[in-house]
């Protein structure tokens, strides 16, 4: 009797959704305090002035202003927010 056992299932066929990382606000764009500027894995870009660093390395604005990217001497890009002048009442 010629017989063949059932073949095992393929080990492929899975994929995970993208993590939506990257720059969310580009240089010169206006941001409000709390806006996410960059979502990243590790500190590919470092925080400068008026920005915070989340525990997942997200860089976010601490003040209202304009985003500024600058390359420093050590070769890393630093992200800052230049604060908008406060309107006199």
UniProtKB/Swiss-Prot annotation:
Region (Disordered): 1-22
Entry-linked SUPFAM superfamilies: Ribosomal L27 protein-like
GO cellular component: cytosolic large ribosomal subunit
Keyword Cell membrane: no
GO molecular function: structural constituent of ribosome
Family, as annotated: Belongs to the bacterial ribosomal protein bL27 family.
HAMAP family associated with the record: Ribosomal_bL27
UniProt protein name: Large ribosomal subunit protein bL27
Gene: rpmA
């Amino acid at each position: 009797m010629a017989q063949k056992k059932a073949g095992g299932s393929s080990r492929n066929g899975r994929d995970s959704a993208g993590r939506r990382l990257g720059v969310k606000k580009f240089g010169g764009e206006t941001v409000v305090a709390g806006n996410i500027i960059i979502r990243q894995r590790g500190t590919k870009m470092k925080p400068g002035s008026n920005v915070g660093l989340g525990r997942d390395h997200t860089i976010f604005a601490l003040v209202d202003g304009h985003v500024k990217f600058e390359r420093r001497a050590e070769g890393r890009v630093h992200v800052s927010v230049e604060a908008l002048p406060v309107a006199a009442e």
